[in-house]
C-alpha cells in the first residue's frame, strides 16, 4: 500500500526542505512536492497530513550491547526489548557487538549472536565482532568474518574479556592486512 506524508519538513544530511514523502510498502519511494507526488500516487494511496512535523530518515545506533554476558552480569535489554525501544525512538537499524568468548571461534561467536537476534528484532541489525581469545586460528578467520559482513572489530581493554597490549598490536597488524 502506498502512503504520502504530505506537508512536512524533510530533514537530511544537506539541510531541511518542505516536501512530501511517498512510501511504497516499507520503503521510501520518492521525496517531492505537488504534481510530482500526485503523478506517483494512485486512488488507493493514503494521504497523511504531517503539516508542521519534521520527517527524519531512520536513525542508526552503531553501539548496542544486547543480551551480553560480561563481568558477572547481563545487559538489561535483549534483542526483543532493545530493538522495540530503539524503534520507538526513531532508530531503524542497530549494530550490536557480537562477542567471541574464551575457547570460541569468531564464527561460533557470530553464530551465537545471530541466534540471539534472529526473529526477535523489531528493526534492521548488523554486528561488530569482539575479539577476546586471540590465537592463530582466529587470525585466519578474519577474512571469513569480512565476507560475512563484519566490517569492524572491538577489543576490550577492561573486564574479563580484555586483551593485553601485545595482543592488541598483533590483532591490529593482522586487521591491516584484511
Q: Model regions: which residues?
A:
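Divalent metal-coordination and catalytic microenvironments
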Residues: 8, 26, 52, 63, ...
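Histidine-rich, glycine-flanked metal-binding segment
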Residues: 1-4, 10-57
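Histidine/acidic-residue-rich, glycine-tolerant segments that coordinate divalent metal ions
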Residues: 100-111, 116-178
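Short, well-ordered turn and helix-capping elements at secondary-structure junctions
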Residues: 9, 32-35, 51, 70, ...
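Metal-associated gating/positioning segment near the N- to mid-region
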Residues: 50-120, 137
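Short amphipathic alpha-helices and their capping/turn segments at secondary-structure boundaries
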Residues: 39-51, 83, 168-178
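Short strand->helix junction
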Residues: 11, 17, 72, 160-161
Amino acid at each position: 500500500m502506498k502512503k504520502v506524508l504530505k506537508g512536512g519538513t524533510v530533514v537530511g544530511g544537506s539541510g531541511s526542505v518542505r516536501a512530501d514523502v511517498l512510501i511504497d510498502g516499507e520503503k521510501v519511494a520518492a521525496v517531492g512536492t505537488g504534481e510530482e507526488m500526485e503523478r506517483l500516487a494512485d486512488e488507493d494511496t493514503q494521504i497523511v497530513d504531517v503539516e508542521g512535523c519534521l520527517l527524519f530518515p531512520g536513525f542508526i545506533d552503531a553501539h548496542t550491547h544486547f543480551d551480553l554476558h560480561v563481568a558477572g552480569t547481563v545487559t538489561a535489554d535483549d534483542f526483543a526489548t532493545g530493538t522495540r525501544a530503539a524503534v520507538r525512538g526513531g532508530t531503524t537499524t542497530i549494530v550490536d557487538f557480537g562477542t567471541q568468548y574464551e575457547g570460541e571461534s569468531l564464527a561460533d561467536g557470530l553464530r551465537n549472536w545471530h541466534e540471539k537476534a534472529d526473529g526477535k528484532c523489531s528493526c534492521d541489525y548488523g554486528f561488530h565482532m569482539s575479539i577476546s581469545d586471540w590465537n592463530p586460528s582466529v587470525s585466519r578467520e578474519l577474512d571469513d568474518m569480512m565476507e560475512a559482513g563484519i566490517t569492524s572489530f572491538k577489543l576490550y581493554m577492561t573486564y574479563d574479556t580484555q586483551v593485553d597490549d601485545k595482543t592488541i598490536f598483533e590483532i591490529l597488524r593482522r586487521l591491516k592486512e584484511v
